[in-house]
C-alpha cells in the first residue's frame, strides 16, 4: 500500500485544522471583550423572556429523533447498494433484502408496541 498517496489528505487536514485554530485564536485575542449585564442578558424580541428556555421535552421527541436516525441510516445504505447492484449480483441483492426485512420487522414491532402513538 502506497502511503504517499494519502499525503495530500493529511496536508489538507493539518492546514485546515491549523487555519481554524489560528482564526479563532486571533478573534479571541484581538476582539473586544467588554462584558456587562446588558450584553449578557437574554434577549427575546425586545421583551424580557416569558419563561425559562431550558424546559423539559417529552420523551417522544427523542424517540422520533432516534427512529429518524435509524431509518435515515437505512436509506444511506440503500443508495450505494443500488449503485453497486450490477456488480454484486444476486448475493448482494439477497443480503439487502434480508437487511430490509429486519428493518421492516423492527418497524412492525415498534408500531405494534405503540412506539409511534403520540397519545
From Swiss-Prot:
It is a multi-pass membrane protein. The keyword Transmembrane helix applies. It is found in: Cell inner membrane. InterPro entries: NAD(P)H_OxRDtase_bac/plastid (IPR023043), NADH_UbQ/plastoQ_OxRdtase_su3 (IPR000440), NDAH_ubi_oxred_su3_sf (IPR038430). The chain crosses the membrane at residues 7-27, 63-83, 88-108. Its EC number is 7.1.1.-. Keywords: Cell inner membrane, Cell membrane, Membrane, NAD, Quinone, Translocase, Transmembrane, Transmembrane helix, Transport, Ubiquinone. One of its GO terms (molecular function) is NADH:ubiquinone reductase (non-electrogenic) activity. GO terms for cellular component: NADH dehydrogenase complex; plasma membrane. Signal peptide: none annotated. It catalyses: a quinone + NADH + 5 H(+)(in) = a quinol + NAD(+) + 4 H(+)(out). NDH-1 is composed of 14 different subunits. Subunits NuoA, H, J, K, L, M, N constitute the membrane sector of the complex. NDH-1 shuttles electrons from NADH, via FMN and iron-sulfur (Fe-S) centers, to quinones in the respiratory chain. The immediate electron acceptor for the enzyme in this species is believed to be ubiquinone. Couples the redox reaction to proton translocation (for every two electrons transferred, four hydrogen ions are translocated across the cytoplasmic membrane), and thus conserves the redox energy in a proton gradient. Belongs to the complex I subunit 3 family. This is NADH-quinone oxidoreductase subunit A. The gene is nuoA.
Amino acid at each position: 500500500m502506497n502511503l504517499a498517496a494519502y499525503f495530500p489528505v493529511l496536508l489538507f487536514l493539518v492546514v485546515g485544522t491549523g487555519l481554524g485554530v489560528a482564526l479563532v485564536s486571533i478573534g479571541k485575542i484581538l476582539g473586544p471583550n467588554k462584558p456587562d449585564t446588558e450584553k449578557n442578558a437574554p434577549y427575546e424580541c425586545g421583551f424580557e423572556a416569558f419563561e425559562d428556555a431550558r424546559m423539559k421535552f417529552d420523551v417522544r421527541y427523542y424517540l422520533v429523533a432516534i427512529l429518524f436516525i435509524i431509518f435515515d441510516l437505512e436509506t444511506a445504505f440503500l443508495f450505494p447498494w443500488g449503485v453497486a447492484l450490477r456488480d454484486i449480483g444476486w448475493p448482494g441483492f439477497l443480503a439487502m433484502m434480508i437487511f430490509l426485512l429486519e428493518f421492516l420487522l423492527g418497524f412492525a414491532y415498534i408500531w405494534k408496541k405503540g412506539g409511534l402513538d403520540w397519545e
